[in-house]
């Protein structure tokens, strides 16, 4: 069995179109494949690149400022640092492709699109670092709570249903921390077939060791 770790990540962006709008902020945490404990984390702002447009409504939505963005790194340095970080946490296997990280996020295909655009600018691709499949907590939420069709369920909605604290929604690292807790909640259900409030609260204490995260199953 390949022991690939999980990467939970999130991009804040200058709009909704990966071909027109850039990444403005990126954050990720690495989780141990078995215990789901956090191994490492990294976050950064990214300077504007490739003449892509940063829309005002996107800044208003994410609460990221131009001052934050201009304090960030170039896209070249972002890609180099990100790929080095991802590579550090690749599982050690004879077949390097099998050791790639398992990507986790809320509506993660959205983030993948923006990340791949940035990597392609540097003659690279996310396929070199992440497994072909991914785990989308948005889809897990829709399946768990019977939400059909094209209706979306936000990270805020999912966290509210599971009593997970989410502060400063749309701040990249805050979203990542909440998504990681949401992922742990789903994994608890998958691994045990149940997730009572007491069991999940105990699981988070064991995994995180941080009391300020509220985490219990919705009634």
Model regions and ranges:
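Conserved non-catalytic scaffold segment of RNase H-like nuclease domains
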Residues: 2-116, 157-164, 170, 212-216
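Short alpha-helix plus adjacent loop in nuclease-associated cores
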Residues: 134-149
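Acidic donor-binding loop at a coil-to-helix junction in glycosyltransferase catalytic cores
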Residues: 174
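Short coil/loop linkers at secondary-structure junctions
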Residues: 64-65, 125-126, 147-148, 165-167
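Substrate-recognition/cap helix-loop segment adjacent to the acidic, metal-dependent catalytic center
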Residues: 111-133
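Acidic two-metal-ion nuclease catalytic site recognized across multiple nuclease folds
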Residues: 161, 177-219
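A structural motif
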Residues: 148-160
